[in-house]
């Protein structure tokens, strides 16, 4: 494991503006462009405004904003002030948000006009609207206070608290340090490459790392972030073309919708970073046929985003891989406490400078001899490429037999009429658990079981099959397995239940 140098010493915009002040920093789709000189002025003014509104010497600023450029301004203002930023999910209910504000011990909650009422109900601290902060580079907004002296940073300082998606459990507040963020940005750019003219489109929520990471990468390298407030297949493909976008982060559902809409990527697009869930082989093949430079990636909040990423040529040549681990990142596949040989499946364990120091609020991170235990199952080949095959706790034990949920889901997805599938175990009085599948596509439960019987052992074939218009997902795009389990248990999809 190798660490990058002990840097930065102050916020990234302070460093960046001294090098390339007139380069474009942010672009709002349908709005204005901002240079790094202008962003630096806004960051300084906002940092002073936050300082005036908080009493703590190391405050935590919670943010309840939809995706917009001001999230980046607030991130760097917090960094300049020496504060911690805690972006909150605007889709959550007030009670959950109140609990998260308490967990992070927020000193101030920044909202938008669209989230003002929710913020007032959820807040455990004073609330200020972003419209009342000097976020605009031209001075629009509230009075501009005297700028603060940039805080001296250490790589161990907690910069962000980001809550997990809650795919398999309650969301946990992940501490991410200055060093975590910079190491992640360096490693990502080392794998993908970076050009001075790069423009990265952000259309993912900025309360998850997929939406936040491009701001850090761009400030580090002096490139631009193009911000779209929400994903829409037609509007997003138009933005990619109109704004000269060279990279974009998407989840599989978004990419599928773009392709379904007939999208042909422009030659300027160099990377489609695809994460938040498994990239199916048919989806990657569609990308190859359309000339989409897809980069399947594996990452998590606890590692400040990417762990491993496949470049397009690797993704096309080695079906299902997420590529080799990024620079600085050590990945060990472990079974029974020992590293696995190539091709042997086990739990994916990650170590390196991108890994969180831990969670807030007493939630324990699982660290072992080889690093952070992700809870994900996978394997590596002899060249170090990684495949991710589901969760350790996705194992279903039915009648004493072990069933791998991801394997069953993969077989179901191979059916020509199936668009997507999720498989979980449901309680069963006779067998302990039974295999259950929620399926998206124009297919009957009987056809799914018949297809499964041709490729799976009898105990692996789903006994419960329901269809749905879409799989329930968390805001970050990952399958919400608890919601899948609830839907299969309750039968709320309105489709038949097998005998």
How should these model regions be labeled?
Residues 184-199, 206-247, 252, 257-262:
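Conserved AMP-binding/adenylation subdomain of ANL enzymes
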Residues 270-271, 279-295, 302-386, 392-395, ...:
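Conserved AMP-binding/adenylate-forming
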Residues 33-37, 152, 156-186, 480:
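Conserved AMP-binding A3 loop
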Residues 5-9, 22-54, 62-68, 72, ...:
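Conserved AMP-binding/adenylate-forming core of the ANL superfamily
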Residues 92-121, 135-137, 184-201, 232-246:
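Conserved ATP-dependent adenylate/AMP-binding module captured primarily in the ANL superfamily
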Residues 352, 357-358, 377-460, 470, ...:
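AMP-binding/adenylate-forming catalytic core of the ANL superfamily
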Residues 4-9, 21-24, 143-163, 168-172, ...:
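Conserved pre-ATP/AMP-binding loop-to-beta segment of ANL
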Residues 114-156, 170:
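ANL superfamily adenylate-forming
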């Amino acid at each position: 494991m190798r660490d990058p140098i002990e840097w930065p010493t102050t916020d990234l915009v302070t460093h960046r503006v001294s090098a390339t002040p007139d380069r474009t920093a942010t672009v709002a789709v349908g709005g204005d462009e901002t240079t790094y000189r202008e962003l630096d002025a806004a960051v300084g003014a906002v940092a002073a405004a936050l300082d005036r509104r908080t009493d703590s010497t190391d405050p935590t600023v919670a943010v309840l904003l939809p995706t917009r450029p001001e999230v980046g301004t607030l991130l760097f203002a917090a960094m300049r002030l020496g504060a911690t930023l805690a972006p909150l999910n605007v889709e959550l209910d007030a009670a959950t948000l109140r609990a998260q504000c308490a967990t992070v011990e927020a000193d101030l909650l920044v909202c938008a006009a669209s989230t003002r009422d929710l913020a007032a109900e959820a807040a455990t601290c004073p609330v200020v609207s972003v419209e009342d902060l000097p976020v605009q580079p031209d001075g629009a907004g509230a009075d501009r206070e005297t700028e603060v002296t940039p805080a001296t940073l250490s790589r161990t300082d907690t910069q962000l608290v980001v809550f997990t998606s809650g795919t398999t459990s309650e969301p946990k507040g992940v501490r991410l340090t200055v060093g975590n963020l910079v190491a992640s940005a360096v490693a990502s750019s080392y794998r993908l490459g970076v050009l001075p003219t790069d423009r990265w489109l952000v259309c993912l929520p900025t309360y998850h790392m997929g939406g936040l990471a491009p701001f850090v990468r761009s400030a580090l390298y002096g490139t631009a972030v193009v911000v779209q407030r929400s994903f829409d297949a037609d509007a997003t493909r138009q933005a990619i073309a109109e704004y000269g976008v060279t990279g974009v982060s998407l989840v599989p559902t978004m990419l599928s919708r773009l392709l379904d809409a007939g999208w042909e990527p422009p030659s300027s697009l160099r990377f489609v970073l695809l994460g938040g869930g498994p990239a199916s082989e048919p989806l990657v093949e569609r990308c190859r046929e359309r000339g989409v430079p897809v980069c399947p990636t594996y990452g998590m909040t606890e590692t400040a985003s990417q762990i491993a990423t496949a470049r397009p040529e690797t993704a096309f040549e080695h079906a299902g891989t997420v590529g080799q681990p990024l620079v600085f990142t050590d990945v060990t596949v472990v079974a029974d406490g020992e590293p696995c040989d190539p091709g042997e499946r086990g739990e994916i364990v990650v170590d390196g400078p991108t890994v969180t120091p831990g969670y807030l609020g007493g939630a324990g991170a699982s660290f072992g001899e080889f690093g952070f235990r992700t809870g994900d199952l996978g394997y590596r080949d002899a060249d170090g490429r990684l495949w991710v095959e589901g969760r350790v706790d996705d194992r279903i034990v039915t009648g004493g037999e072990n069933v791998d949920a991801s394997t069953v889901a993969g077989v179901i997805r191979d059916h020509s009429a199936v668009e997507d599938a999720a498989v979980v175990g449901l309680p069963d009085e006779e067998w302990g658990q039974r295999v259950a599948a929620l399926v998206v596509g124009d297919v009957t439960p009987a056809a799914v079981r018949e297809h499964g019987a041709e490729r799976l052992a009898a105990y692996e074939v789903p006994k419960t099959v329901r269809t749905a218009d879409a799989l329930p997902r968390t805001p970050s795009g990952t399958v919400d397995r608890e919601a899948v389990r609830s839907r299969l248990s309750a039968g709320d999809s309105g489709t038949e239940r097998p005998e």
